[in-house]
């Protein structure tokens, strides 16, 4: 019930966070748990709201993902968030260098 109250932006971020923490797309998780037909249906529905359940997370190539990673790491540093080892760790200083070069 709680997930039904997400805004479009919150839903997009949740899809990215699921991939960040598991290394598996939301589409593949739904496919494993509910089957391919349901995963296809859910992804088709998500596309009406400008979302894609196959979206991954890569702060090296996507500026939005970089901002999300920055917020997460600051939240952990400042003890607002509990640390949970992600599927893949990112060095925030290296990410900043990458994005400074791209600007």
Language model: regions and residue ranges:
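Sec-dependent signal peptide cleavage junction
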Residues: 91-103
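Mid-length scaffold segments of soluble, non-membrane domains
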Residues: 1-28
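Long, amphipathic alpha-helical surface segments
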Residues: 27-94
